[in-house]
């Protein structure tokens, strides 16, 4: 009897370390996976921060507006925001919310949804003259020589600067509303084409365009 008990104890002792070692390996794998997940999450957060840091936001106007409902008037704020990376991308957004911060956030999100790519020349100007209209507002923009700067005012200047244009002449015609002027400037920028693209559309050479 003593021999059988001793054998059974020796078997239990020899078999017990195996599952313990397996559990230790599983725990180490879980720790490694969790660490890897944390590193991936940090990398994605850094990438998102870098992308957000490329964009600049400027608030053109904040107004308190009201909406007539069944129970009376509902007050809210409207924010007009221009978003751009100064590298040829710019957008204008409008946001409405019960507070100013919420309205600005919605305006930024709306501006990033309506981005326009602007072809820039080596001297940070535009390739050709362009005219844009929105409602009663009309904006005329034309290229300028290096060192001219941004000759524009109001919301038009903000749109041109955040697009990365540093030498341009702009003239406002018609309405003075900031939103209409900003949108008219966006239309004018969206109509811009490089000389190469224009030649391709017309089916002619670049020499014929310059001549």
Swiss-Prot record:
Keywords: Ribonucleoprotein, Ribosomal protein, RNA-binding, rRNA-binding
Family matches, as InterPro entries: Ribosomal_Su5_D2-typ_SF (IPR020568), Ribosomal_uS5 (IPR000851), Ribosomal_uS5_bac-type (IPR005712), Ribosomal_uS5_C (IPR005324), Ribosomal_uS5_N (IPR013810), Ribosomal_uS5_N_CS (IPR018192), Ribsml_uS5_D2-typ_fold_subgr (IPR014721)
One Pfam family it belongs to: Ribosomal_S5
Tagged with keyword Transferase: no
Family: Belongs to the universal ribosomal protein uS5 family.
Domain note: The N-terminal domain interacts with the head of the 30S subunit; the C-terminal domain interacts with the body and contacts protein S4. The interaction surface between S4 and S5 is involved in control of translational fidelity.
Protein's UniProt name: Small ribosomal subunit protein uS5
Organism classification: Bacteria, Bacillati, Cyanobacteriota, Cyanophyceae, Synechococcales
